[in-house]
Amino acid sequence: MSKFIEPSIEEIKLEKLYQDMGLSDAEYNKVCEILGREPNFTEVGIFSVMWSEHCSYKHSKPFLKQFPTTGEHVLMGPGEGAGVVDIGDNQAVVFKVESHNHPSAIEPYQGAATGVGGIIRDIVSIGARPINLLNSLRFGELSVKQNQRLLKGVVRGIGGYGNCIGIPTTAGEIEFDDRYDGNPLVNAMCVGVIDHDMIQKGTAKGEGNSVIYVGLKTGRDGIHGATFASEELTEESESKRPSVQIGDPFVGKKLMEATLEAITFDELVGIQDMGAAGLTSSSSEMAAKGGSGLELHLDQVPTREPGISPYEMMLSETQERMLLVVEKGTEQKFLDLFEKHELDSAVIGEVTNTDRFVLKYEDEVFADIPVQSLADEAPVYVLEGEEKEYNTSKNDYSSINVEETFKKLLIHPTIASKHYLYEQYDQQVGANTIIKPGLQSSVVRVEGTNKAVASTIDGEARYVFNQPYEGGKMVVAEAYRNLIAVGATPLAMTDCLNYGSPEKKEIYQQLIDSTKGMSEACEVLKTPVVSGNVSLYNETRGTSIFPTPVVGMVGLIEDIDYLKDFHPEAGHKLYLVGETRDDFGGSQVEKLLYGKVNHEFEAIDLSDEVNKGEAVKNTIRSGVASHVQTVGKGGLLITLARISAHYGLGLEASIDLSDAQLFSETQGRYIIVVKEGQTLNIDEAIEIGQLTDVDEFKVTNAQSSIVEKVSEIKESWEGAIAQCLTTVD
C-alpha cells in the first residue's frame, strides 16, 4: 500500500482531473499512448508542467525557430540556461531575460523578487558571475490604486532581492497603460561574465554518476507555478497564491558563491537551476540533453516538513535550488563544499544508461517515463491568424498646443523620470558601474580590464500593436540604438515575448508578424538571439495586454577611456541626426490627445540604422561627443527636456520643424552633444542649439517658442511618479 494518498488512475481518467492540471483531453490521450498505459497522479503532474506553455513553448516554437541564433561572437545559443557571447581575451558575457508576470500580479513583492532570483541562478548555472541586473516593467495607469500597489510591491521586490544578493540594478524601462490593468509585466534580465574554459552546460551523462540536490529544502510553495504561468488571469487566480514562490536572497547569495566554487571542480559533469517546474524540469531536461536516463530517490530529497509527496516534491518551485551531476565517487567533495557554505545538500539519484526517467520513494515507483517524451514530444500547435481591423483614419495635429502638450507629456509616468523608483535599487555595488540608470544604457566595467559591457532592455508595445511586423523590427532597432548611444558595439540579444492568448486569431497573427519583423532586424543589425522566454495568456477578464516583445541586448566597449569625459557641459553644441517626419501612430502624443492607436507610421529602414549607427559610434569613440541620446518616447522636444533636466543645464535650440513634429516619434534619430572645439563629421547632422549655464529651457520653431525654467522642468519630471504614489499607503 502506498505511503501517500492520491487520486487513483481511474479517478484521474473518469473525473478528468488532468484538465485541472492543464492537460487537454487530446494531450492526456497522447500521454497514454507514450506510456502504453494510463498515467498515475505523479506522472500526470509531470507531463502537465513539462507540456505547459511556459516549459514547452507549444504555441511559439514555430516562431522561435526563425530567429537567427548564430554569429561571429556567439559561443552558446538557445537551449541552455542562458546565452553566451565572446568579448575577447578568453572572456564571455552571459545573459538572459525571463518573465514573472502572473506571480507578480498576485503577489507583487515575491513575484518580482523570485523573478530576479531565478534569472540570477540561470546566469550562475552557466558558471558566470553576475555583474548587473535590468528590468522591463508594465503596469496599468497610476490613477488606479491597484496599479500603484502593484508598482510599489514589484519595485520593492526587485530592490529587496538584488540589493541583498549584491548585484547592482543598472538599467530598465517602465511604461504605464490601461491595457496592463490587472496584468502587469515583470521581465528581469541578468548579465554575467565568465572565462571560456569555465562555461557549464545542464547535462546528465555518464552511467553511475550521481545527482546532487543543493539549496533550500523543498516545500509546497510554487506547486504548478509553470501551469499557473500558462493560464489567463481570472478572478479565481487570487486563490492560486500558493503557486507564487517565496525568495530568500541570503540563501541565494550563499548558493551563488557555492555554485561558482563548484564549477572549478573537474568532477562536475553538469548543473542546472531548479526554476519553472522545479526538480521535474531540471532533472528531465538534463537527462534529455545528455542522452541518458535518470533514477531519483525522492526519500533522499531535503524537505521542509514531513509528508511531502513525490507529486509535491517534483512540482514544487521552492526557490534557491540547484541540481548537479558529478562523477561517481566524488560526491563528498561537493557535499563538503555545500556544508561549508551552510547549504542543505544530498545525493538524490544517479544517471542510467536507459532512456527512462524513474522516480522512487523508498521501494515504490512513482513515475517511469521515457525521458525524451518530456523534452521533445510535447505537442506543437500551429494555429490560424487573422489581421485585426486597423483604425486608418488620420488624426489632426495641426492646431496642437505645444506648451500644454509638452507639460502633460513630461509628467506622464511613462515619460517622467524613474529616479524615484531606481533610487530604491543599489546601482553601484561592486564599484564597476560606469553609467547608472537615467537616460542611457547601462555600462559596467569588466573587472581587471579596460573593457566594459553595455546592456539595455527595451519594448515598443504600442507600435507592435499598431503594426506588428514593423513594430517587431522597431523594438530590436531601439535596443541597437541605445547601445550605439554609449559607443558600444551591439553583439547579441535575448527576448521575452509577452502576448495574450494565442488561441485568439488576432493575437496569433501578432505573434506571426512581430516575430518575423524581429527576426529580420536581427539579421540586418547582426544581433542574433541567444536566449529568451515566452509569456502567453497575459489576459485579464478577457482583455489582452498590448503585444509586448521585450528585447535585452548587450554590447562591447573595448576601451572605456572615452567615457571619462562623456558628460555634457554648458557651451556644448546640440546636433540632430536623422529625418523627422509626421510619425504619430503609436506615439505618446497620440495617446495623450486621441487615446486609441492609429495605423499610421512609415517603415523602418534597417540599412540606414546600420549606417547611422556606425557613424554615431565612431563619433563617440573619437572623443567628439559628450553625450548621445536617442530620440524616443514623446519626440524631440521631450528628449531635449530630459537631457536638460537630467544634467541640470540650460538649453537653447532653434528647430526647423512644425509644432506637431516636435512630438513626432520618427525612428532612427539621435541627439549628439558635441564638445567645445570639436567638429562633428556626420553628413546629415543638423546643428540645432547648445547647452547653457542659465536656468532656461528655450526651444523655438517657425510657429512657436517654448520657454521654461530648467529647475521647474526638473522638479516636474523627477517628481511626477512620487506624486502619483502619494495616494497609496
Curated annotation (Swiss-Prot):
Binding site for Mg(2+) 2: 122, 273
Pathway note: Purine metabolism; IMP biosynthesis via de novo pathway; 5-amino-1-(5-phospho-D-ribosyl)imidazole from N(2)-formyl-N(1)-(5-phospho-D-ribosyl)glycinamide: step 1/2
Binding site for ATP: 57, 96, 495, 532
EC id: 6.3.5.3
InterPro entries: PRibForGlyAmidine_synth_PurL, PurL_linker, PurM-like_C_dom, PurM-like_C_sf, PurM-like_N, PurM-like_N_sf
UniProt binding sites for Mg(2+) 1: 98, 533
Primary location: cytoplasm
SUPFAM superfamilies: PurM C-terminal domain-like, PurM N-terminal domain-like
Name by which UniProt lists this protein: Phosphoribosylformylglycinamidine synthase subunit PurL
Gene source species: Staphylococcus haemolyticus (strain JCSC1435)
Lineage: Bacteria, Bacillati, Bacillota, Bacilli, Bacillales
